[in-house]
């Protein structure tokens, strides 16, 4: 469920929950209750100084773009940022420094076609399509082997 604050519906995510687009999309099933802002809280200290910190920021940028929602990120070691609804990092704190990030964020109400689609179907149609393509590829491969064997 979303948190209601200052006229916005803020959907909290913890750590890598923003990796799972279906989890976030489920929050858009009821348009009247759909979040207007995402907020991610993460303890990413155990990643150290690795690519995972930037990767997690990029995942949040992608989710902001997919759902056209601003994304607020608060972390303990790096990648604390404000991301706009287009996936652009508007503000970011330096990594591994204690600081406070402030800024203004306005939520968005409209659901993207992606959000509407994912809220209803999830990734199942894509998975089914991938299985059909894989099946056709295997069928073609076996058919080619049979031709070689009969030649």
Model-derived features: where do they sit?
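Solvent-exposed soluble domains appended to multi-pass membrane proteins
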Residues: 1-151
């Amino acid at each position: 469920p979303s948190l209601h604050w200052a006229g916005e519906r803020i959907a909290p995510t913890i750590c890598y929950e923003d990796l799972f687009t279906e989890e976030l999309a489920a929050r858009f099933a009821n348009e009247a209750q759909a979040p207007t802002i995402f907020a991610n809280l993460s303890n990413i200290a155990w990643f150290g100084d690795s690519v995972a910190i930037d990767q997690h920021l990029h995942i949040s940028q992608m989710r902001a773009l997919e759902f056209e929602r601003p994304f607020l990120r608060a972390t303990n070691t790096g990648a604390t940022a404000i991301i706009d609804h287009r996936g652009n990092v508007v503000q970011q704190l330096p990594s591994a420094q204690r600081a406070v990030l402030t800024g203004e964020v306005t939520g968005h109400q409209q659901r993207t076609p992606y959000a509407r689609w994912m809220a209803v179907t999830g990734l199942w149609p894509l998975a089914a399509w991938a299985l059909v393509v894989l099946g056709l590829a295997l069928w073609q491969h076996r058919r080619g082997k049979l031709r070689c064997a009969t030649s």
